[in-house]
Amino acid sequence: MVKAIEIIDLHVTLGREASRVHVLNGINLTINAGEAVGLVGASGSGKSTLLMVMAGLEQAEKGQVLVAGEDFTAMNEDSLARFRGKHIGIVFQSFHLIPTMTALENVAVPLELAHHPDPFGRAEQELNAVGLSHRLNHFPAELSGGEQQRVALARAMAPDPTLLFADEPTGNLDEANGLAIVDLLFALRRERQTTLVLVTHDSELAARCDRTIRLRSGHIEA
């Protein structure tokens, strides 16, 4: 099996001096290409921090983080930003859409940054794929929560990433919209063979993944 992510003896500490907290302690983990993995655990267990490290948004204090064969811990900020733009898509609980941009413009932003030859054409394709062809020119404030998360998903998938990270993607949605987003997320992932790492408190959602990893107090439970 091809390894999408390999983590070796990962340690992460947050805070300063007396208030420092050991969030992750000696994590060892391998995720294979095309696999869907759910990260579960109580609040404060370290699952979101682990996702952020794998996505290149949080630094490791110690250890190695190999993503698509590249060592995040050896990259400078510019190299890491380029790598994220090419290989990684992220969907958060909060939609993080730019309020002054339309749905189409929001999805086109990462494509423009990556110098895609047709960012708006590609963005329109992705919005069509998530069922928002009729909302291209609407601003976030004109969209429902479910529609905003669809825009966020389209934005994450537009660069055709090899890895998709989702941190509580249904946390701000009602049950019906949450289920629709999950169905769409898994359908797109399956269609494109994208590696998925999903943080969730929902055991039913985690069960849809190929494998579930439980964290407790910064450790992976055996």
What are these regions (language model features)?
Residues 4-5, 10-208, 212-215:
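ABC family nucleotide-binding domain
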Residues 190, 221-222:
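C-terminal segments of enzyme domains that contribute to small-molecule binding surfaces
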